[in-house]
């Protein structure tokens, strides 16, 4: 006899926290909890594209993402995992 599973509503997705982040060769690299490393290009994000390498290297880790205070840009880890790297021109 099969029993119906109970639908308790939408499942919450908790993106892993960033442990460290750096800028290298026109890409942002992020090491996440669990050891995964993400790399994504700065192209397509006007704020990051117009920033100097020094500004791009000043990344603040936030519980849910990355912040570049010099260029007032914030990207969430959840968005990065979806392929959303910020504002598009």
Segments the model singles out, each with a brief description of its role:
Residues 1-89:
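Motif-centric detector for short Cys/His coordination patterns
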